[in-house]
Curated annotation (Swiss-Prot):
Organism listed in the record: Nitrosococcus oceani (strain ATCC 19707 / BCRC 17464 / JCM 30415 / NCIMB 11848 / C-107)
The protein, known as: Phosphoglycerate kinase
Binding site for ATP: K197, E319, G345, G346, D347, T348
Subunit annotation: Monomer.
Pathway the protein acts in: Carbohydrate degradation; glycolysis; pyruvate from D-glyceraldehyde 3-phosphate: step 2/5
Subcellular location field: Cytoplasm
The protein's enzyme class: transferase
UniProt binding sites for substrate: D21, L22, N23, R36, H59, L60, G61, R62, R113, R146
EC identifiers of the protein: 2.7.2.3
Amino acid sequence: MPILKMSELDLAGKRVLIREDLNVPLKNGEITDDTRIRASLPSIQQAMQAGAKVMVMSHLGRPTEGEFDAAFSLAPVAGYLSHLLGQEVRLAPDWLEGMAVEKGQLVLCENVRFNRGEKKNDEALAKKMAALCDIYVMDAFGSAHRAQASTHGVAKYAPVACAGPLLAGELEALGKALENPARPLVAIVGGSKVSTKLTVLESLSQVVDQLIVGGGIANTFIAAADYNVGKSLYEADLVGTAKQLRTAAQEGGGDIPLPVDVVCGQEFSENAEAVLKRIGKVTDEDMIFDIGPETSKHFAEILKGAGTIVWNGPVGVFEFDQFGEGTKALALAIAESPAFSIAGGGDTLAAVAKYGVGDQVSYISTGGGAFLEFLEGKQLPAVAILEERASQ
């Protein structure tokens, strides 16, 4: 269903309330990764340049709802935005009571989670937010899977509700990757547990041509193929499920390829010695931490021949260099592949940054949970309400 886009509206002189995802990591009050702030900049600048009175709201961390806590204040973000925009960005602590904003100016609303009722999508709170604006812009893809007052409720009651450029771009890229993909469609799903990504694996295994699994997830599939995984992280209770998923994928003409060689260690540490082994030679004392070079080469060939690639999660413990070669090889293969590629999820973005392939991945998603729920085929509440408003 279509949604209204901010780019289609005349914003001049209008009070525009934008929900961004500025939930950035902080250390001693300093921002350690500004990716989300930079991703939101084009939307904010577009509204300011159009002569709108711009108000931006976001959450930060997980404070006790309804209570101010300086550790979760957006003050560092306001300072950072001032620096990037080259003009003062005021932080408004009691913004729900209304605030004066000039045309072309930006005010940052203090952490939405300091308001009681935010997470529960409280109607009275949502109406207060809606009363602040002429146009509400949902631009926080990273929070689109949450039905909260600042992502969902406000869109119900604002005079006009639309999608910002970042959200619109995410939906377009994900649609291109999953709704009408160029084939073969290859997905990489890494991570420690099958249980947390089971619905993603089930959903993707039915639509992709090849599903490459990595990390602890791969260990469960290796165990399902009756190989010893030693002391590796895996889920014994989901071995049967992994077997069924692989069989179903193969019956549908696809596959979940398994490693032929792996890199093992005896302890989880950056000093652990990396030992290369054939998959059938893993001992009871071993822990599998990465895929081996032969497997990397095989998976890289699959990626280079793909039409579309969806990447969510590393295939090894890449934060330790000796167990990062597999993830590095796949990152470089994705970069070299002519396929349309989309990467999402925190660990994935860290791998993209570590191996310097950001410019060669077609689209980098800012969403973690929202990215996964989209992959599961779930309706995102914040998008659903925009569709509903557009059809009224």
